[in-house]
Every structure is written in structure tokens, then in C-alpha cells.
Amino acid sequence: MFPLNNAFTNTNFSAGDGKALCATDHPTVGASDLSNVLATASDLNETSLEQAVIDLSDFTDSRGLQIAARPRRLIVAPYNQFVATRILDTELRPGTADNDINALRSNGTIPEGYSVNHFFTTSTKKWWFVMTDVPNGMKHFTRTPMQTGMDGDFDTGNVRYKARERYS
């Protein structure tokens, strides 16, 4: 969870372009800089999630052509899990007396729903992220696959287990 816990600073972690993971000025090859954060920082609510979906639809490739990015899943800290349920799972608009439909749910905007990340640090408890269907996004490599071993002691019947794996 290191990349997400440090997404807004590149003090400890920066992406391949030298910027923080969530930055307003990711350089592209031929087009203008790309922002993957809301113009105005906002807590998770219906309006901010709708704006994130709209912003995603404006993503362009290095030639300036729209790439039709779509959201797949909302990732939230435990602090926001009930807010996410209200936004994504209710039939009517959350938090209003209006009888409007919940457009996010009705349109199937976030098809995989939300998942709770229990490893966000205290300072990131209100953060939320939208996973997209954009290919070649954030990469995960298993540097050393899971290796397990065990050692048994015949005299005592004790058994020791170990496991090791590495990621990047």
C-alpha cells in the first residue's frame, strides 16, 4: 500500500515520470499535461465521484485523442465504506429529499462496486481512488514468487514454517 499511502507526495515515492502518483501535471509525449486528481480536493460524495467519472472521460493519449477511459472500481478506506455503499448501492440519490434516480447506480458507472482498503494510514483515512480500465496503468511485479518451507523436530513434535516473497 506504499504507493497509495504516498500518492500525493513524491518525497518517498514517485511514479515513472518523476511526479507523485496523484499529480496535476503528469507530462505526456505530445499532448498537454495530464491531471489525475480533482481540480478541487473533495471528500467522497456523490458530486465528487460524478466529477471524477467526467474527468476520466476527458483523458487523452499522447496524440491528444480521447482514450475512452472508464471507471471499474472505487477503492476506499474503512472511514468511507458506508459513504461508498450509500453512493453506489441505493436506488435513489443519496442524501437528498429528491426522488431522483441514483445515476451512478442506474448507469452501472462503477461496475465492480467498491472495495475497502484496510491498509491506508491514519493520514489517508478520507482518501478514495477510482480504478480504471486504462491499459498499461500501474504495474505490479512479483520479483520472487512465494517460497515456503517447513522444519519438523522429531523429539518435540514442533514444526516451524516459513514463507518468503518479494514485489515491486
Residue ranges, per PLM feature:
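Long, contiguous amphipathic alpha-helices that act as assembly "spine/axial" helices in icosahedral shell
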Residues: 1-12, 74, 161-163
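Arginine/glycine-rich "motif VI" loop of SF2 helicases in the C-terminal RecA-like domain
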Residues: 65
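Sequence/fold signature of self-assembling virion shell proteins
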Residues: 18-58, 68-73, 79-168
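Conserved helix-loop functional segments at active or binding sites
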Residues: 6, 58, 62
